[in-house]
């Protein structure tokens, strides 16, 4: 729906969406959509290691795409669908741990906590280079974020879509894809319509 709303290549966006996360296949248990609440493998890992493993699915996906001889336009989407986005959960977790270590640092004989390098918690990129790659970035982020909506009312869905798109703009993730502001607005409306339709049966008015 997003691609159609702005006259982008709808088929390419669909195929890119089908294949964008193939890099997760080898370690599926590490990702939120496959983790059971009682057994989270990240509980035993450092935030840095978790971020490294999570971001690796882009490189793994690109390798699988090339091995499977997918068209370059599709492997580009696999490589670009996270851009250089921040893995915010583990970056925040690392900062919390770092602050706790700093409070402890005043005690004799304990080493100083090393500073947090934000780049260690970012995807390698590149940023989306096409409108289709940006659409897959939006759709992927919204699919994940919408799962956390306890009450998917139209107002909450509008806020979710608006916040995600604004976040990508502020973070510079759309700087190289060629989307205009008018197209971004149309994409926002298309995603709001699609998500509202998907969650309609769950909304308690």
Feature names for model-found ranges:
Residues 169, 174-205:
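Long, hydrophobic alpha-helical segments that serve as membrane-spanning/inserting helices
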Residues 1-161, 167-171:
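Divalent metal-dependent catalytic cores for phosphoryl transfer on phosphate-bearing substrates
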